Amino acid sequence: FVTSFDLAVLNLEGTVTGNESLSLKDKNILRFTFEPIALDAVFNTGFDIVSLSNNHTSDFGREGFLETTKNLEARNLKYFGDYFNESETLVVEKKGLKIAFVGFNEFAYKNFDQVLERIKKASNENDVVFVFAHFGEEYKDFGNSFQQKNARMFIDSGADAVIGAHPHVVQNIEIYK
């Protein structure tokens, strides 16, 4: 099914390391990590791109994040949304279109203006811009005012679509502009 699409993007909500899924400080706190072999299933299922724009890609610090990107690169999986570097944008060409992927993580990014500038730049240089925004409240089936306000600012800055994640439930869709 996934292979029938021109591009398929997956939100990788955790690291890909050899670590155990336990906090180093408190054994009662789970930290999300996957065995590297799990990426073989991601690749074989047909996913092309992985979003790392979420609140669990830092569960094992910068070292765990770098191990994750190394594991992705070993399987030729493209990625975007560096938890530690707000300036990253992924651009891929597909069927003659330049498509930009910009990650936004409510829990990591400190410089919101920089995110808007990245979207503007991506819009000026590419045909399509997708913003993957990791934001909102867990288990709420309707987006909050923060999500709506920021998603609209992303669109106003040049994004063609904003895809949200984090709440663990399906939320509403808004057609804006």
Question: Each PLM stretch: what is its role?
Answer:
Residues F1-K177:
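Acidic, metal/ion-coordinating pockets
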